[in-house]
Curated annotation (Swiss-Prot):
The keyword Ribosomal protein applies. It comes from Moorella thermoacetica (strain ATCC 39073 / JCM 9320). Gene3D superfamilies: Ribosomal protein L14. The gene is rplN. Binds to 23S rRNA. Forms part of two intersubunit bridges in the 70S ribosome. GO terms for molecular function: large ribosomal subunit rRNA binding; structural constituent of ribosome. Belongs to the universal ribosomal protein uL14 family. Disulfide bonds: none annotated. Part of the 50S ribosomal subunit. Forms a cluster with proteins L3 and L19. In the 70S ribosome, L14 and L19 interact and together make contacts with the 16S rRNA in bridges B5 and B8. It comes from the Bacteria. Keywords: Ribonucleoprotein, Ribosomal protein, RNA-binding, rRNA-binding. GO terms for cellular component: cytosolic large ribosomal subunit. InterPro entries: Ribosomal_uL14, Ribosomal_uL14_bac-type, Ribosomal_uL14_CS, Ribosomal_uL14_sf. This is Large ribosomal subunit protein uL14. One of its GO terms (biological process) is translation.
Length: 122
């Protein structure tokens, strides 16, 4: 469950280290984002020489959450951190590598490029 002011780790190699959620996309009263939802975020920490720098406002898709996500078969999946991948307007990742596992829910939301780059899909 990601909401405004939530800090997330970045799961790609764009140069950003931490993001802060500014807005959850998908309706004016939308409060929470889960795995596969798109957010608007601000870069709070970045490494020098990266694609993005501190203070940039970016679009990102949530790939891991601490809050458990219920699957249609009744099982739950949860991770030990909140993480997101920075994307462009066409929902393609801006980085060339994805770090850490990602949830299978991204496949239903048509983030196939992220699925193919990820080392593990849970």
């Amino acid at each position: 469950m990601i909401q405004q002011q939530t800090l997330l780790k970045v799961g790609d190699n764009t140069g950003a280290r931490k993001l802060m959620c500014i807005r959850v996309l998908g309706g004016s009263k939308r409060r929470y984002a889960s795995v596969g939802d798109v957010i608007i975020a601000s870069v709070k920490e970045a490494t020098p020489g990266g694609v993005v720098k501190k203070g940039d406002v970016v679009r990102a898709v949530v790939v891991r959450t601490k809050k458990a996500v219920k699957r249609p078969d009744g099982s739950y999946i949860r991770f030990n951190e909140n993480a997101a991948v920075i994307i462009n307007e066409q929902n393609n990742p801006r980085g060339t590598r994805i770090f850490g596992p990602v949830a299978r829910e991204l496949r239903e939301k048509d983030f196939m490029k992220i699925i193919s780059l990820a080392p593990e899909v849970l």
